[in-house]
Amino acid sequence: MAMSQVVNTYPLSNYSFGTKEPKLEKDTSVADRLARMKINYMKEGMRTSVEGILLVQEHNHPHILLLQIGNTFCKLPGGRLKPGENEADGLKRKLTSKLGGNSAALVPDWTVGECVATWWRPNFETMMYPYCPPHITKPKECKRLYIVHLSEKEYFAVPKNLKLLAVPLFELYDNVQRYGPVISTIPQQLSRFHFNMISS
C-alpha cells in the first residue's frame, strides 16, 4: 500500500506580507471575461490555466491562501498559460506576478508539487466540471490545480487592490455558495495527503 504524500505546513506567522502596485482585472464583468475568452479561443484554441494551492497552518489546521477581489469574490493565485508554456513554469510566472516582490531577492522559491485536480469548461459559460462531458469534443478551457510547497519563511507582496486571506479547510468544505465549486472541493482533493504541522 502506498504511503500518503506529506505536505509540510508552517505557521502563518512565519510569513511576512507587504504591498505592491494594484493588479487590475482585465474584465469588469463576467460577460466581458467570457467574451474575451471567446476571442482568445478563436486565436489560440483551448485555454489552459493553472492555479496554486498555497498552504499554511493556524491552530494546527491547514489554511489555504486566497486572493480576495472586492468584498466577496475569492480566487486561487494563478492564471492562463502562454501557448506551449510548461505548466510548472507558467504557474511560477503567475505566482510571481500575483505575489512576488519587486526584486528577485523578494520572490518566493516556488516549488510546484502535485496536480490535485483538473477542471473543464465545456462552453463559454461560468460552469466548470471535474471531467469533460462526453458530448464535448472541443472544450474551451482546462484548469489544473497544483499544490505549491512553501518554504519555512517567505515574503509575499500583495497588490494594493487585493487582500490575501488564509482560509481554513473546514470553511471551504462544501461551501459552494461562498467559494464556488472549484475552491469548495479542495478539502476533498487534499484528503489523500498527510499534513505535517510544523510549529515555529
From Swiss-Prot:
Single GO cellular component term: cytosol
Domain Nudix hydrolase: 45-172
UniProt-listed InterPro entries: Cleav_polyA_spec_factor_su5, NUDIX_hydrolase-like_dom_sf
Pfam families, sorted: NUDIX_2
Location(s) in or outside the cell: Nucleus
Listed GO biological process terms: mRNA 3'-end processing; rRNA processing
Annotated stretches, region: Interaction with RNA: 72-74
Site (Interaction with RNA): 33, 179
Annotated motif Nudix box, positions: 79-100
Family according to the record: Belongs to the Nudix hydrolase family. CPSF5 subfamily.
Subunit structure: Homodimer. Component of the cleavage factor Im (CFIm) complex. Forms a complex with cleavage and polyadenylation specificity factor (CPSF) subunits FIPS5, PAPS4 and CPSF30.
Protein purpose: Component of the cleavage factor Im (CFIm) complex that plays a key role in pre-mRNA 3'-processing. Involved in association with CPSF6 or CPSF7 in pre-MRNA 3'-end poly(A) site cleavage and poly(A) addition. NUDT21/CPSF5 binds to cleavage and polyadenylation RNA substrates. The homodimer mediates simultaneous sequence-specific recognition of two 5'-UGUA-3' elements within the pre-mRNA. Binds to, but does not hydrolyze mono- and di-adenosine nucleotides. May have a role in mRNA export.
Protein name: Pre-mRNA cleavage factor Im 25 kDa subunit 2
This protein's encoding gene: CFIS2
